[in-house]
């Protein structure tokens, strides 16, 4: 029989793991599992290959017209216009002041002896003598002595007007008149053609986070973890059936921002858009400096005859003319009958003068008498007929139209002209008083010419004679005094470089140089700041359509490329379907403060407040005037007589009337002051808030200097500015606009930055005629500002390249120069100092800051970088800081 069970043996060591059993049959379907946790976001996939360029899209429909662009920058000066037609003759000038009285002329030649005067009255009868015998006819007596010269004859009638004198030789060129005042600004030139497209700008700063993208596709399964230690074998369960898929888990948290994709290729340029509307006229450019003197043109066309000028004042006496020729001898008179000779009577007492006897036989011609003194000057002759029209000159080349100058001061009197041809002999004067009968004298010889007579007064100006041949050019007049440096002109087209010479005064104009050959196309420059809208170009021809490429796989988002050049506006595309609402993004950072908004509409009147406390008693008024009261007051039956019945007595009426007039005058002045308070007129007493407010209240006011008070309050800190009506701006001028004669301090020669305020012996910052609080308010009341600086150079560079240039410091201590980023870089309007200018000659570079960041202006300091060596020099001219106002 079996024995009893033995004791339980010790537990054996663990056996080797058994081999895997065969798969069990599928177990029953398990219960639905709980929703699993959201899986982590998969790793970012490898960027796909760059897709091929897509086929060019159909042109979109035309877009709506863009907003009006800002006025373009002033284009370069246009080519000189054709010479204008000859203007209408100017109105006659005013009579000049009479010339100085001429010196007394030399004694004129003695006039010819006058004709015999009429017979005198008969004398009283003498005592009759005894009749004598008739004697024989006596022998003619010897010639008696020459009688005394007769009295001068009466002045002869004025002779006919002599022929027009030959044209005198051309007088010397008169001295150059004083420089006239600057003419008014000319009409603004046409907008220049758009400049070339600049090079692409540097990449912008990283933008803010965009709206979160849609969820990515699930990542691939991760690698298996390391195998765990083997566990104790469990009892083999029956395999369960495969359960259904669980519902998707909740949306996981947003994954981190993916790596930036590769930079995509630049898209093809869009087709040119439709022609835009014509832009507004650009701002008026600054006045250019006077150009070089042009060549002397050939004579212009013959102008129409001018209107006859008014008679000028008497000119200075001309030199005496030559003596006139002797007149022809008069006809011999008829012989008188001889009287009978009487006997010699006893000499009686001298009787009274008897009647004049009949004229005796004329004696032979006596010696020529001396020429008598000149008679008084006859009346002016009639005006001569106009001369024939001269030949037409060659047309001159078109000159540059200059600005109209004001009338210059009258020139000095010219030198006396050459003597004219002597006039013909005048008609014979009336008979002179009778001379005593002389005996026939012997023929006298021709007398010597007498001294010159006094010159006659100048007759009226004759009509213009035939135009003389063109005279040779007179010597150049001395240069006028140097005017103040004008504001910078608009950059002209760059001409050929002339030969270097020693700077001197302007010489005679040289011949016009030939146009230089067309330069090679330069490399594309960096993208500049957005320029003002230029003239709309004509649409270009569309390019050939490329072959359609196969669509490539989508690539990763590339890094934002630099902004390309602005394309022409495309046509408007079709309206797309509305997109799905995106998830709300995270709140963005606070943006920069916007520009000052326009004033809102006037709100409704508020509720009337409670009455305020009574004010303090006012000062005592001026004495009243019962005279005014007597006009204004009338009594009535209910309340008794008006106070006019109690007015003062009639004796005081005149005083009261004067007082009443003074009061009315004061009231009128107060009324005007109230008007000035409501609509300030820009005076020192009533300054406007800004120039825009001034022109808003006074539309008839023109551009000029006015007082403004931007910060309001007391008018003691009002500032005087230049108000530009066209540009709607208030311009503040520096107190020291022109800076020159600067000498470097020792130790600054090697430093690159040489600021006005530190590096020069006569150091100075640029200051302005305005308190900084007023300028702050001007900035607030404007929406953009601009200012320019002119750097005049001699052997000194101003703007060499993108790394080296002068520097401007704004009032916010920011520096603006060639290597600044684009938004801070000044605009170069003219650059003659890029390479130091022409050798030993002055040139200039003009820079402008035009910005909506009004805190940058005005400019307070300037730094030069290429000065200090021998032969180098520079000057500065700081323009006004102009704040352009908001139209509210």
From Swiss-Prot:
Annotated ranges, domain Fibrillar collagen NC1: 661-884
Tissue expr: Component of the acid-insoluble organic matrix of the aragonitic skeleton (at protein level).
Localization: Secreted
Low complexity composition-biased segments: 59-73, 148-164, 194-203, 422-440, 460-475, 508-518
Biased composition (Pro residues): 311-320, 610-622
GO terms of molecular function: extracellular matrix structural constituent
Domain of life: Eukaryota
Domain Collagen-like: 3-60, 513-571
Broad class of the protein's primary localization: secreted
Gly residues compositional bias, start-end: 441-450
InterPro entries: Collagen (IPR008160), Collagen_superfamily (IPR050149), Fib_collagen_C (IPR000885)
Family: Belongs to the fibrillar collagen family.
The protein, known as: Collagen alpha chain
Species name: Acropora millepora
Species classification: Eukaryota, Metazoa, Cnidaria, Anthozoa, Hexacorallia
């Amino acid at each position: 029989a079996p024995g009893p069970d033995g004791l339980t043996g010790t537990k054996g060591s663990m056996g080797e793991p058994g081999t895997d059993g065969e798969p069990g049959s599928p177990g029953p379907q398990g219960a639905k599992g709980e929703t699993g946790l959201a899986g982590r976001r998969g790793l970012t996939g490898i960027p796909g290959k760059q897709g091929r360029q897509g086929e060019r899209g159909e042109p979109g429909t035309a877009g709506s017209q863009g907003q009006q662009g800002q006025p373009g920058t002033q284009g370069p000066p246009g080519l000189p216009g054709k010479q204008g037609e000859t203007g209408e003759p100017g109105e006659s000038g005013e009579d000049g002041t009479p010339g100085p009285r001429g010196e007394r002329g030399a004694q004129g030649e003695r006039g010819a002896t006058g004709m015999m005067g009429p017979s005198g009255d008969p004398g009283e009868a003498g005592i009759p003598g005894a009749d004598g015998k008739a004697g024989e006819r006596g022998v003619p007596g010897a010639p008696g002595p020459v009688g005394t010269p007769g009295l001068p004859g009466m002045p002869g009638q004025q002779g006919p007007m002599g022929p027009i004198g030959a044209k005198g030789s051309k007088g010397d060129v008169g001295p150059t008149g004083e420089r006239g005042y600057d003419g008014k600004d000319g009409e603004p030139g046409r907008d220049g053609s758009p400049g070339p497209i600049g090079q692409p700008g540097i990449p912008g700063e990283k933008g803010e986070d965009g709206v979160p993208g849609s969820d990515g596709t699930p990542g691939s399964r991760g690698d298996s973890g390391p195998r765990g230690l083997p566990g104790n074998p469990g009892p083999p369960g029956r395999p369960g059936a495969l359960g259904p898929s669980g519902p998707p888990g909740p949306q996981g948290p947003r994954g981190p921002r993916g790596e930036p994709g590769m930079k995509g290729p630049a898209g093809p340029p869009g087709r040119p858009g439709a022609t835009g509307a014509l832009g507004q006229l650009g701002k008026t450019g600054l006045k250019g400096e006077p150009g070089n003197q042009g060549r002397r043109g050939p004579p212009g066309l013959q102008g129409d005859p001018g209107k006859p000028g008014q008679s000028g004042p008497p000119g200075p006496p001309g030199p005496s003319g030559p003596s006139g020729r002797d007149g022809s001898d008069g006809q011999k008179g008829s012989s008188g009958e001889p009287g009978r000779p009487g006997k010699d009577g006893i000499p009686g007492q001298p009787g009274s003068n008897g009647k004049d006897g009949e004229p005796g036989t004329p004696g032979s011609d006596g010696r020529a008498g001396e020429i008598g003194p000149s008679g008084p000057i006859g009346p002016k002759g009639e005006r001569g007929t106009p001369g024939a029209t001269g030949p037409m000159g060659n047309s001159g080349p078109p000159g540059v139209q200059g600005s109209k100058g004001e009338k210059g001061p009258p020139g000095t009197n010219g030198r006396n002209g050459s003597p004219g041809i002597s006039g013909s002999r005048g008609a014979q004067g009336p008979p002179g008083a009778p001379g005593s009968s002389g005996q026939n004298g012997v023929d006298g010889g021709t007398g010597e010419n007498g001294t010159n007579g006094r010159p006659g007064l100048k007759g009226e100006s004759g009509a213009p004679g035939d135009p003389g041949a063109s005279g040779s050019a007179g010597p150049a007049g001395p240069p006028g005094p140097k005017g103040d440096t004008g504001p910078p002109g608009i950059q002209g087209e760059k001409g050929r470089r002339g030969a270097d010479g020693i700077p001197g005064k302007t010489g005679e104009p040289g011949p016009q140089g030939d146009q230089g050959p067309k330069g090679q196309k330069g490399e594309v420059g960096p993208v500049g700041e957005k320029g003002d809208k230029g003239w709309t170009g004509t649409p270009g021809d569309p390019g050939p359509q490329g072959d359609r490429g196969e669509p490539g796989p989508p690539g990763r988002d590339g890094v934002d490329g630099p902004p390309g050049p602005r394309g022409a506006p495309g046509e408007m595309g079709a309206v797309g379907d509305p997109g799905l609402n995106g998830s709300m993004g995270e709140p963005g950072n606070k943006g920069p403060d916007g520009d000052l908004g326009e004033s809102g509409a006037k709100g409704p009147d508020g509720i009337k407040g409670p009455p305020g406390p009574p004010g303090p008693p006012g000062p005592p008024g001026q004495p009243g005037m019962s005279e005014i009261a007597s006009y204004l007051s009338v009594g009535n039956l209910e309340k008794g007589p008006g106070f006019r019945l109690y007015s003062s007595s009639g004796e005081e009426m005149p005083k009261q009337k004067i007082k009443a007039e003074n009061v009315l005058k004061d009231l009128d002045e107060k009324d005007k002051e109230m008007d000035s308070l409501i609509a300030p007129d820009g005076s020192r007493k009533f300054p406007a808030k800004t120039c825009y407010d001034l022109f808003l209240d006074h539309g008839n006011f023109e551009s000029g200097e006015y007082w403004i008070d931007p910060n309001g309050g007391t008018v003691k800190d009002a500032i005087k500015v230049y108000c530009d009506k066209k540009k709607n701006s208030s311009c503040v001028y520096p107190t020291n606009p022109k800076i020159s004669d600067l000498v470097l301090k020792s130790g600054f020669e090697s430093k690159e930055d040489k600021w006005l305020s530190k590096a020069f012996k006569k150091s100075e910052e640029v200051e302005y005629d305005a308190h900084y609080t007023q300028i702050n308010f001007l900035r607030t009341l404007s929406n953009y500002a601009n200012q320019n600086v002119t750097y005049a150079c001699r052997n000194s560079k101003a703007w060499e390249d993108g790394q080296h240039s002068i520097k401007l410091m704004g009032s916010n201590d920011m520096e603006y120069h060639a290597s600044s980023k684009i938004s801070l870089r000044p605009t170069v309007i003219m650059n003659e100092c890029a390479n130091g200018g022409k050798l030993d000659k002055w040139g200039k570079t003009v820079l402008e800051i035009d910005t909506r960041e009004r805190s940058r202006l005005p400019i307070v300091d300037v730094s030069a970088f290429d000065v200090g060596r021998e032969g180098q020099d520079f000057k500065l001219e700081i323009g006004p800081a102009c704040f352009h106002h908001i139209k509210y």
